[in-house]
């Protein structure tokens, strides 16, 4: 749930990058941190867990105007994808306003993607949130690895596995090269702000 800071005239939204372990969530955030450094306030905080990390930092989206005369600040988080960090993932989702689900395009990761999406749905439900109503964007990461002859799933296959019911916006990407990273983030921020404006109108 977005936080209103009336003193600073600021609205803070929280966007979480979710998905299977080693799928590219951290790489997405690291790319954003480097590429959009002028729009970032403060440092990137990294909490190391064995074989994975939880990252977060504040991002100021430019050119998106104001809501109710307030500036917008977005907090970007990743969650550790490994199965054993279920409690951490659930904790990071608390108060979430928008989600980027980073799916791994490698053929061998097909099951992991589907399990992670189910895990997301379950954790959201425990907070009283519906995966079909939360602003959600999918990114099909590691598309560049096809050039190296590594077997990838087709976009059609990934859409069928993950997005047949959700019908969420989806972007092919390569987080290491930055392909699709900005588009994914921009779409998620816009969807999140639209949902927030709707919420505020209901609250009048």
Predicted feature residues:
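Conserved G1/Walker A P-loop phosphate-binding module
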Residues: 2-48
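Conserved catalytic network of the ASCE P-loop NTPase/AAA+ motor domain
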Residues: 8, 52-55, 65-70, 91-95, ...
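Conserved nucleotide-binding/hydrolysis micro-motifs of P-loop NTPases
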Residues: 22, 82, 106-108, 142-146, ...
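Inter-motif core of Ras-like GTPase G domains
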Residues: 86-108
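Switch I (G2) and immediately adjacent beta-strands of P-loop GTPase domains
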Residues: 45-84
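Conserved C-terminal guanine-recognition region of P-loop GTPase G domains, centered on the G4
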Residues: 105-165
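Canonical P-loop GTPase G-domain recognition
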Residues: 144-202
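Conserved beta-strand segments of the P-loop GTPase G domain that flank and frequently precede/overlap
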Residues: 76-78, 100-104, 137-141, 172
């Amino acid at each position: 749930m977005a936080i209103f800071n009336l003193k600073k005239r600021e609205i803070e939204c929280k966007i979480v990058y979710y998905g299977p372990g080693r799928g590219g969530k951290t790489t997405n955030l690291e790319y954003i941190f480097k590429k959009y450094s002028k729009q970032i306030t403060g440092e990137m905080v990294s909490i190391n867990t064995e074989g994975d990390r939880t990252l977060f930092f504040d991002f100021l989206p430019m050119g998106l105007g104001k809501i109710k005369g307030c500036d917008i600040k977005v907090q970007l988080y990743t969650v550790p994808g490994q199965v054993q960090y279920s409690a951490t993932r659930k904790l990071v989702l608390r108060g979430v306003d928008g989600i980027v689900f980073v799916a791994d395009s490698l053929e061998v990761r097909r099951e992991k993607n589907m399990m992670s999406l189910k895990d997301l749905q379950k954790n959201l439900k425990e907070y009283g949130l519906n995966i079909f109503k939360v602003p959600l964007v999918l990114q099909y990461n590691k598309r560049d690895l096809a050039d190296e002859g590594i077997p990838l799933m087709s976009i059609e296959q990934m859409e069928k596995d993950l997005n047949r019911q959700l019908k969420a916006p989806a972007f092919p990407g390569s987080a290491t090269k930055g392909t699709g990273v900005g588009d994914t983030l921009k779409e998620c921020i816009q969807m999140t702000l639209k949902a927030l404006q709707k919420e505020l109108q209901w609250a009048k």
